[in-house]
From Swiss-Prot:
One of its GO terms (molecular function) is neuropeptide hormone activity. It comes from Ictalurus punctatus. Disulfide bonds: none annotated. Keywords: Amidation, Cleavage on pair of basic residues, Neuropeptide, Secreted, Signal. The keyword Signal applies. Gene3D superfamilies: 6.10.250.900. This is Pro-neuropeptide Y. One of its GO terms (cellular component) is extracellular space. It comes from the Eukaryota.
Length: 95
């Protein structure tokens, strides 16, 4: 019975992975269709506008409010205040 249960869990994991990938792919913007070389000027203008929008979506930076990581790094590593490390051999009552 055990090997059959392991196979079922494996198949369920594969199906779940495929479903997750499909959901992720739906959220990705689609590339605009090329109207062709003989298209009117208005359609080419719409295509280039849609292509510019698509490229801006794909290549935008996703850093949030602060895009400069140099400012953020020291605060994360050291904090704003200097931390005094206390040895466990230092007795606060004796000093």
């Amino acid at each position: 019975m055990r090997p059959r249960a392991n196979v079922c869990v494996g198949w369920a994991a594969c199906i779940l992975l495929v479903v997750c990938l499909c959901v992720l792919a739906e959220g990705y913007p689609t590339k605009p269709e090329n109207p062709g070389e003989d298209a009117p000027v208005e359609e080419l203008a719409k295509y280039y506008s849609a292509l510019r929008h698509y490229i801006n979506l794909i290549t935008r930076q996703r850093y949030g409010k602060r895009s400069n990581t140099d400012v953020l790094t020291p605060d994360l590593l050291f904090g704003e205040a200097e931390i005094r490390l206390q040895s466990r051999y230092d007795d606060p009552l004796m000093g």
